[in-house]
Amino acid sequence: MAFKEMEDYIKNKTNYPLRERYDMPDSKLTFPGGAQARIEISGIESASNLEEMVKEADKRNITVHRVISIVRGTTMLDDQELKYFAQIGADNDLELLVNPVASRAWDTGRQYTSGEEGIVSGMRLRGHDMLYRYLKNIDRCIEAGIRGFLITDEAALTLLNDMREEGIIPEDVKFKVSFLAGHGTAVSGKLLENLGADSFNPL
């Protein structure tokens, strides 16, 4: 097999660039409302952080559209705290995206924290008990008023999207694949879109 055949396949049979597109044209896709760009703030880990962000944005007359929040996991918040967090978002027209569970360092095994091999093993869920607890926290967040989730596991994304299509999960719930899942090409983006991702943060 000649590499030239691979190149020709990508050029002629796919919509993917062969190399990096330094001449990238403007996208024809837009956010709701027609904007080509929006402001997303990350690192908001508590209700007090969110309140201060809202105050600062108001003071500077800046519209913040989306907030990447509680990356440490919503399991760290009790129900009252989670509902208050969601209410701040609703009152200020903010799209909140949360991580429903704590990181792999909190799971039932030590692999993730046991050196280089564990670190590169990824942030995916391990075992069906973890998947079960993950889904329970998704439900808890939805009940609290959260409508956006950071996803680090493609299998969980597939299941969640199937549930959204069936109407079990509200259709207005959004799934954004985190950079922690390790995707960084247009091919990855298409894969994640096919699995149900509404957006993703590349490496």
List the predicted regions and their residue ranges:
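Secondary-structure boundary/capping micro-motif
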Residues: 32-34
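Non-catalytic positions within long, well-ordered alpha-helices that form the structural scaffold/packing
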Residues: 58-60, 142, 193-194
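A short, Lys/Arg-enriched amphipathic alpha-helix followed by its capping loop at the start of a domain
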Residues: 52-64
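Catalytic alpha/beta core domains of metabolic enzymes, predominantly
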Residues: 166-203
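Active-site catalytic pocket residues across diverse enzymes, especially alpha/beta-hydrolases
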Residues: 57, 164-167
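Active-site beta->alpha loop and helix N-cap motifs at the rims of alpha/beta catalytic domains
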Residues: 7-21, 41-54, 68-162, 174-180
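Short acidic/polar active-site loop segments enriched in Thr and Asp
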Residues: 63-65, 147, 198
